[in-house]
From Swiss-Prot:
It comes from the Bacteria. One of its GO terms (cellular component) is cytoplasm. This is 3-hydroxydecanoyl-[acyl-carrier-protein] dehydratase. It catalyses: a (3R)-hydroxyacyl-[ACP] = a (2E)-enoyl-[ACP] + H2O; (3R)-hydroxydecanoyl-[ACP] = (2E)-decenoyl-[ACP] + H2O; (2E)-decenoyl-[ACP] = (3Z)-decenoyl-[ACP]. Keywords: Cytoplasm, Fatty acid biosynthesis, Fatty acid metabolism, Isomerase, Lipid biosynthesis, Lipid metabolism, Lyase. Homodimer. Its EC number is 4.2.1.59, 5.3.3.14. The active site is at H71. Pathway: Lipid metabolism; fatty acid biosynthesis. Necessary for the introduction of cis unsaturation into fatty acids. Catalyzes the dehydration of (3R)-3-hydroxydecanoyl-ACP to E-(2)-decenoyl-ACP and then its isomerization to Z-(3)-decenoyl-ACP. Can catalyze the dehydratase reaction for beta-hydroxyacyl-ACPs with saturated chain lengths up to 16:0, being most active on intermediate chain length.
Amino acid sequence: MRDRRSSYEYEDLLACGRGELFGPGNAQLPLPPMLMFDRITEISETGGAHGKGLIRAELDVNPDLWFFACHFKGDPVMPGCLGLDALWQMLGFFLGWSGGEGPGRALGSGELKFTGQVLPHVRKVVYNVDIKRVMRSKLWLGIADGWLSADDEIIYRAQDLKVGLFKQTAAKPAA
């Protein structure tokens, strides 16, 4: 049975990372430190900019987050690729939540724009993913647009994010 709530707390996200939320072998979030949000505040198969669903999540920012210590020394900033990865994580979660089977993989994105930075003084990051299309066949493919805001200012925009769920992706042991 899949967990179909409309919001999820941090412990739920950790359960997803352990493969406990959508069943063994299905969509998982990464575990910390690569899990890039603290809660999912809204998820729905309706609504969003395209009327086909949305997912919204938040990250509480503090100067002790792991990436500030190494990116960059004396000039701390959250790497833009981590914000992009959060959007892919959310799209994969949406596919698992929607009933897709198999582990997820990011497949790409269209246009991506960064117009600001997540710095240690930022209090909250909000991520939003608006579903454009979900293809359900052997491969489940989600296509969406997303944005990231830092303290209520949108600073990243991504178009045509793509994530797929694949029934067979397990790494084969080296010969």
